[in-house]
Amino acid sequence: MSNPTYVQEYNAIVDVLSQYNEGGAKADSTLMKPAFNEQATLFGVDGDKLVGGAIQNLYDVIDNSFRPSPEARAAIVRIDIVGTAASARVDTDNVSGFRFTDFFNLLKVDGQWTIVSKIYH
């Protein structure tokens, strides 16, 4: 079998999303960095204003404003895969006292799934 199956691709994406979840729960961006492409972006809305930009903004918040949250729980609600593109929704409770819904876009680059964008609520 030379081509990966859907289940293999799905599980590879779950592994990437798990790196993100672990970094958030442990308040350590070094644990989540491997999940993201170096050119990745993140965006959200604060009040009525668009906020975000380079993924470094996320790392800074994780390292400076979050605290380890062993009580954090995350659920991968959905993963859609088409060829080398995928999207995912992850709902997280109790990360530094917050509840998040994250939407990720991933691409398979050089045989590895990587997050290229994140939007959040």
Can you annotate each of these PLM segments?
Residues M1-E22, K26, T30, P34-E38:
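Short, low-complexity N-terminal intrinsically disordered segments enriched in polar/charged residues
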Residues E9-A12, T41-R99:
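Surface-exposed, charged secondary-structure patches
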Residues T30, V82, F104-L107:
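Intrinsic disorder/low-complexity detector
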Residues F36, T92-N94, I119-Y120:
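Short beta-strand segments enriched in hydrophobic/aromatic residues
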Residues R99-H121:
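Short beta-strand edge/turn micro-motifs at domain boundaries
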